[in-house]
Amino acid sequence: MDYSYLNSYDSCVAAMEASAYGDFGACSQPGGFQYSPLRPAFPAAGPPCPALGSSNCALGALRDHQPAPYSAVPYKFFPEPSGLHEKRKQRRIRTTFTSAQLKELERVFAETHYPDIYTREELALKIDLTEARVQVWFQNRRAKFRKQERAASAKGAAGATGAKKGEARCSSEDDDSKESTCSPTPDSTASLPPPPAPSLASPRLSPSPLPAALGSGPGPQPLKGALWAGVAGGGGGGPGTGAAELLKAWQPAEPGPGPFSGVLSSFHRKPGPALKTNLF
């Protein structure tokens, strides 16, 4: 086998030591150097490797080679979201109104709820505010006014409903009391005494309807005679005995079917004395 290429490598190293790394101008060509991970295999047989000189020294090129610096990577890979930044910029500071400004604003609001642009500009100059601030204040004030109106109307409706319910309750209680006083309840009807039934003995004590009921005829004459006979017969004993005899004459000895049965029975029992003692 031919090992002549080993001798050429030794001669190349000797030449490098002789030059003492003095001149790398011819060998330093970093632009033309390219690294390839796939190294070709050594040929089994081929022409001998030429002698390495200062012009084509690969080792000097490796020593002198410096990798190109990496391009500067930006610190922020993604741009900052502009929406959040703009929102922070658009956020306004709350305006604090003084008492004098509020007084002037309320005065204009009492005059009109919707002032025009000229009125707003004049008011803004007067109270040292911007026209936009004045416009926003009027918008908020109108919203507050509408809210107060709705609350007041709801409260009034609730009060009217409560008053109507109270009136209806009072009227129902009055109706109940009237019904309780006018119409008797079953308990009250049970406690009341029953009306007196017409008694059959009442016509016996009243002598006035007897002559009219008996009619014309000889009947009333014996009746009068019997009455006077009873009175005359009891005259000697006193007024009490005469009244007792009179009541006995009126009362029937036996119950009869009619109201005048007692009178008729007494008339039939005492016909003689009645005729004898007739004063008329």
Swiss-Prot record:
Coiled coil feature spans: none
Principal location: nucleus
Pfam families registered for this protein in UniProt: Homeodomain (PF00046)
Residue span of region Disordered: 145-244, 260-280
Ranges of biased composition (kind: Gly residues): 231-241
GO MF terms held by the record: DNA-binding transcription activator activity, RNA polymerase II-specific; RNA polymerase II transcription regulatory region sequence-specific DNA binding; sequence-specific double-stranded DNA binding
GO CC annotation, single: chromatin
The UniProt record lists the keyword Transcription: yes
Gene Ontology biological process: locus ceruleus development; midbrain development; noradrenergic neuron differentiation; oculomotor nerve formation; parasympathetic nervous system development; regulation of respiratory gaseous exchange; regulation of transcription by RNA polymerase II; somatic motor neuron differentiation
Domain of life according to the entry: Eukaryota
Compartments (UniProt record): Nucleus
Low complexity compositional bias, start-end: 153-163, 199-215
Record key words, sorted: Activator, Developmental protein, DNA-binding, Homeobox, Nucleus, Transcription, Transcription regulation
Record feature DNA-binding region, as residue ranges: 90-149
Similarity field: Belongs to the paired homeobox family.
Function as written in the Swiss-Prot or TrEMBL entry: May be involved in regulating the specificity of expression of the catecholamine biosynthetic genes. Acts as a transcription activator/factor. Could maintain the noradrenergic phenotype.
Stated name of the protein: Paired mesoderm homeobox protein 2A
